Design a protein with these regions (language model features):
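Conserved positions within compact, well-structured domain cores
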Residues: 47-245
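Sec-dependent signal peptide cleavage junction
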Residues: 20-52
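Compositionally biased amphipathic helical and low-complexity segments enriched in hydrophobic
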Residues: 8-12, 37, 60
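Bacterial Sec-dependent N-terminal signal peptides
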Residues: 1-25
Length: 245
């Protein structure tokens, strides 16, 4: 019987599923999950360095989505919390209040373009990852909602992290997915509590709300629903970058 041994970096493996005596092995290539055929053994080599920022997922949408949040070490890591329009993450000792902002309501016009979208210079994803990475717009969050299947996990793959497994519904892309961990948020001096009984996730968009200069759109994740809503911009939320080509 012909055998095949595959040497793969540990973090490049998408998943291994077992049914009776057979195993299906997938690896990550060019933003897609690719199935390996006739695999009898695997050898894992730990990489010296893995650039998560370089890993994107093609869900068949208008933009590609990052596998991780800004500041995260992996898919289930929450990453860094940002106030809207700020590019430096705040620490757990910081009070997310308006008097600690770099900007005020009076100069918010200098942060956005004519479409009320954050300038790249004020975009946390672009400032931290560079290249063509940026924060998603309100419309791109809605596109993600409308074209994917969203499955809530209280404990994703026994990591202790709650969040949504989001799989594409687009033909040709249905094996591709991202995971958005529910990391809660900073509200004034109150710190995130992602381990509470009913975790919630909050992700900033780059879109300013039209009815007030101190509000911006965000994606809210709950076990019962996910919605695009608006919130006051000093809240500390997570950022999931998108890649616009």
């Amino acid at each position: 019987m012909k055998t095949k041994t595959i040497l793969l970096s540990l973090l490049c493996i998408v998943g291994i599923t077992t049914a009776t005596a057979q195993s299906d092995v997938y690896y990550w290539k060019d933003g897609k999950a690719v199935k390996l055929e006739t695999v009898d053994s695997l050898t894992f080599n730990a990489p010296e360095h893995f650039d998560f920022a370089a890993q994107w997922v093609d869900l068949g949408l208008s933009v590609k989505w990052a596998r991780t949040n800004v500041g995260a070490a992996g898919m289930t890591d929450y990453g860094t919390y940002f106030a809207w329009g700020e590019t430096t993450g705040w620490t757990s000792d910081t009070n997310y209040a308006k008097n600690n902002f770099e900007w005020t309501e009076r100069d918010v016009d200098a942060l956005v373009d004519e479409n009320l979208t954050l300038l790249l210079s004020r975009d946390a994803a672009h400032a931290n990852w560079g290249g063509s990475w940026r924060m998603p717009t309100r419309e791109e969050f809605q596109e993600l909602k409308d074209n994917c299947t969203w499955t809530w996990y209280d404990d994703y793959h026994h990591t202790g992290v709650a969040g949504y497994y989001i799989a594409s519904n687009k033909p040709g892309f249905t094996d591709n997915y991202i995971f958005l961990p529910a990391g809660d948020l900073f509200v004034g001096p109150n710190k995130p509590n992602p381990k509470k009984e009913h975790p919630i996730g909050y992700y900033w968009s780059s879109t300013l709300h039209t009815h007030g200069y101190d509000y911006a759109f965000y994606l809210e994740l709950r076990d019962s629903r996910c919605v695009v809503d608006e919130a006051t911009s000093e809240f500390g939320m997570l950022v999931r970058p998108v890649l616009a080509e």
